Structure formats: C-alpha cells, structure tokens
C-alpha cells in the first residue's frame, strides 16, 4: 500500500486515506496503536473534508477478537459524532433545538459525561460483550472471571472497560504506552503478563457503565456558556483515562425524533480537543535515566511554533518507538501539542537509519536491559537514578523547599548521594559545595524544618519510592501495620491484606528489605510523623465504619481534607467520586442539585454537613436519596 503524503493538508486520495484509516483502526482495536488518537482524528477529519460520503465515515469502527463467540446487540452500539471546536458544539445545540421544536419541545435538557478511553462493551447481567461492529460484538464474559470489576454491579448496560488512571500512572506507565493497550491485552489473551495480572489482583481494571459516570446536566445555553468549566470539573472528578466529553440530549422524545445514522446517534456529540501539529527534523536524541532505571529518549528538533510556544524538545516515550519507527537523527517527524501538554512524537514521516540505540547506560555505562519496549539501567547506584530518588523524596514529602533537581545534582556530585548523608549536612557543608551564604542557610534550615513539620506517615513511606508503594498503597498498608512493624513483615503477611496480590507483595517485601536500613535511620532522626489510623483500632460501632464516603463543596467546620482524615479514623472508605460503591455523599456549601443527581440515581444517601456531623456524633440521619433538606 502506498504511503500517505507527509503533510495531512497534502492528502488528496480518499481511497488511499480510507485504507490507511482501516489499518490504523485495526491496530488500535487490537491494543497496538500505530498513531496517536489525536493524529487519527485529524486524518478522519481530512477524509471528511475531501470525501464526506466515504464509506469509512458511515461505518462503526469494529474490533475483532479471535476465538470469541459473536453476540448480537438488542440495539445498535454506535460511534459518536465529534466536535473539535466551540462552533461545532454550537451547531449541534442549534440543531437539537430546531429538531425539538418540530415536535413541540422547548425545554431541552442536556447531559455531559466523560468520554472514557477504553474498550466499549455491554453488560446485560448474563453476558459482557464488546461493541464489535455496533450490531454484533464478542462474548468477553470471562474477563470478569479474570478480575475485571463491574462498577455498580452487573447488568447496568453500556459502558467501557478501563484501568484506573492514577494506578496506571503510578505503577504501569513505564510498562505500557497507554492503559488501553493493557486492557485489550487482558480481554484478548489467555496468557497475561505479570503487570496485567497484578492490575487485576489489585482490582484496578473496571467495567464502568456509562450510567455510573459523573455527569453535568443543564440547558443548551448553560452548556455553551460553561463548556470549559464543565469539562474541567468532570476531568477532576474522574480517575479513568479520557479522550474528551460526550454531550447528549436527555429528552427521550427528542432522541426518538432525531434518530441515528448508520454511524452515530444524532442526539449525541463528543467534545474533543484538537491538538496542533507541525513537521520538523530530528537533530539529536538525548537519553534520560529515571528513578526506576528507565532510559527514555528525548528528541532534540529543529525549532517550530505550536500552540504559541517554540518547540525544541519532543518526548518519544520509549526506545521501542525509536527503533520501530526510525525516529533517528535526520528523520522528518510530525509533532503534536495540545494546550499546555508536553509536545509528543506523533508520526515519523521520513524514517532515518541513524537510530543508534545505546547498549550501555548514558550515565554509569552499565549494560542496559530491554523490558518490553523500554530500556532499563539495572544499576541501583547509577548517579542519575540516585539523583531522581533523592528528588522524588523531597517532592513527595512536600515539606522542604529549595531541593530542586539542580540542587540535588550538585549535592550528589559533591558526594552527598544518600538521604543519610544529606540529612547530616550543616550550613558549612553546603558552603563547601559553593552554594551562596543565603542559599546554604536556607538549605540547612529546610532540612531541619522537614523533620519538625508534621507529615503523614504514608507520605513519608511513599517518598522512599519503593515499587508498588505509592501514596495510595502506602496509606492502605499503614492502616494495617504501624510503620515500624511493617519493616519486619514478609510477603505472606502482606498478601493476606485486602488489596495486595502475590506480585505486589513480593515487590514490597523486596523494597522494604533493600531500604529498611535507610528507613530506620530516617525514623531515628525524629520526623514529626502523623500516624495513619489502624483499622484494628477504628471504632467499628461508628455509623460510617466500612462505608464509602464522598465529600463535596466547601465545609464550615474544617477543611475537606481534615474531614476526610476524620472519616478515615472512623473507619470510612473515603472516595474521590460517587460510584455504585458509595454510601454517603456529604455536601458542603455551593453544591447545586445537579451535582447530587448521580448520587440519587445510584441510591446514595445525600447529607448536608450538619446532618453528617449529627450522624457521626451518634444521631440518626433522616436524609435519603429522595429526601434532601437543602436541594
């Protein structure tokens, strides 16, 4: 098949473009994307420009799964029309009101939900099936047996299979290029790699029904006036990978009147950000070593302007992309930048043979190892890894200023290459490294302040950078064991805890053993640690013990963070957003009725701040999803 022109604007052959889009779509559905979502969307829009009646644009983009039973859907699972700018959204709203007026409807209600970036599926309570071609999909019910969690329970209809975003970023981002790649692998393969197994053991891969998603509701006028704020609010409340928002008409009679094409429902549109792309040339490749040892490529390119900024460096994510796509010195590449996002390698237009992949670490010269598409330096004492570990400590601890990466690099170069050495430094030591008098004083004071300022013990533990002990899991594990006791626990002790699987337990035991002396040394320095409440000491008689609790709005009796910590001490499971596992939604000031709608739909008890305080202080809550005193 002939290659496409290097510039999207130069593509003029709709049949060739359609063939490439089919190829790109097939790779994407198989969990092995050849180009990014943004680049794919730009190509689809180009096809729409040059051949608006092309068959590809009217067909649902199908996925296939070998050896899976085909299942017909009771109603079509179609794709979604897309809006990349405010004008497209305005035209959609205008069209809706025009169609609604034809049947005498003037009060049209719109809903906006996150557009999850996963694998679309349908759960009827008996069978979990993929979207397929929109009319028939594939039976993947065994995904639930593998460990995929149905949020809100079974039988809630259409939804998306996704990995929890925060978990992916903390534990898997250095092993998979995108969460969707892992999800498709879990669904399509009977043999799972260790990382995918661990994600399933940790209950971090979910089937999320669209009905359980956070949502906004309002008029078309409110949607157009507040679309950016609506989007930001939903992004903050959603811990799943997303590639936009979906705006839908809620009035069933308007939906029925507007109907659908063979490709999408006319009463629904996806709101997506359109990244700006440009073409440049690779001048050099810089290899950077991270805290975990991953050696990642940064492309030094001919300067170009994108989204109002001059781009000189572009991330290429991993060495595998350099090797496979020929993104070496002299290559012509397409770069994309969306808003303030770091510019990324989008596509290699003219490959280069000059893709020399380093065999040794660029910092310590230790032979590198391949881990899937990633290069890794196995040397724990590599200078770059040491610098990044120390920087990670101060960044996560969050109570000591002045220790940026440049300062840390100077400390390590001067021989202060461990936390033990740095925390023994005096003002004179900083002066000896040619820091100025004022900066030396500030650094010495910052060291002392970091010991005396209050810090949560889970944050202290997470700052050591132990694999599989990020902030969330550190908080979780310290609710079972005090920090001092944890250091002596084995993998058997850890695997017995809820939420910790075999692979994670082995990794944590290994990390605690390796860093045990450092952790004990730092504990002996007398940090002002705030202990995590132990589950064994929690008041099981508390009315919120074991309950899922979400706080929203501005609280009067204290900060939301303080109220969340107090709820945890009473045994509650404090959550970020309302789901089917939420029991109570506690609303402070400035929370409108629309924000409580999801809780009502899911049968969650909605309480005002005062009603919540009465509840935990021994009173009985009289509120229910149907009876809310303030809304």
From Swiss-Prot:
SMART domains: BRCT, LIGANc
Stated family: Belongs to the NAD-dependent DNA ligase family. LigA subfamily.
Active site positions: 115
Summary of the function given for this chain in its UniProt record: DNA ligase that catalyzes the formation of phosphodiester linkages between 5'-phosphoryl and 3'-hydroxyl groups in double-stranded DNA using NAD as a coenzyme and as the energy source for the reaction. It is essential for DNA replication and repair of damaged DNA.
GO MF annotations, alphabetized: DNA ligase (NAD+) activity; metal ion binding
Species for this entry: Desulfatibacillum aliphaticivorans
Name of the molecule in the record: DNA ligase
Residues that hold Zn(2+) according to the record: 361, 364, 377, 382
